[in-house]
Amino acid sequence: MTTRFKLCSFKTCPWVHRAAIVLREKGIDYEIEYIDRHNRPDWFQAISPHSKVPVLIVDGEHALFESNAIAEYLDEVAEPRLHPEDPILRARNRAWTDYVPNFSQVTHISNAVDEDDFNARVEKAQIPASRLEGALEKRGNDGPFFNGEKFSLVDAAYAPALLRFTFLDRVRPTGLLDDKPLLTAWRDALIAYPAVLNGVVPEFHDVWQDQVRTNGKWVVQFLPSAAAAE
């Protein structure tokens, strides 16, 4: 009997995107249900201890939460395996996957309230970005992905933040990656990868821009007007 999967999501959530990338890369069919983040239903809060997405519902009865746990579960139950076979490499991948919350502050740059705040957020993001550049220098391969030619779970973990950062960087350049050629190349490979592109809603760039406009922060002035975008 085929296992049934339902992914509970917000349309712009990077952590859901990570789970969706893994599902797409493994060719797993799944249903997606979007939750109103401003009015989260009781049934959802009952299965999500943090009242957050993603939640993966398996066969209508098992609710898994936290993107890392979901990704690891999917890698255990479906081919192709997205973790390296070598135990040292696998542990290293998991360690750098645990670093994603530090790096994901690049997605918060768009929340700056003014130019000074914007510059401060970019400067703060230099530390995790530089450390990630250093990790890529020591990975022992030429890419394009973290482990070389094969797309892995660690790639799925970083792709959502890098895609959203790139949207921002194109409308209001940050200079964050100017001296980080390996991180730039990795970013370019990830944001062009089919599972990454297919793991979000259609016209996701427009959806992201709409969210930024709704937030009403300083970077809104650099977006094309909604009328022009249409």
Which residues fall in each region the model found?
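Short secondary-structure junctions and interdomain/linker hinges
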Residues: 114, 139, 194-197, 211
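Long, charge-rich low-complexity segments
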Residues: 197-229
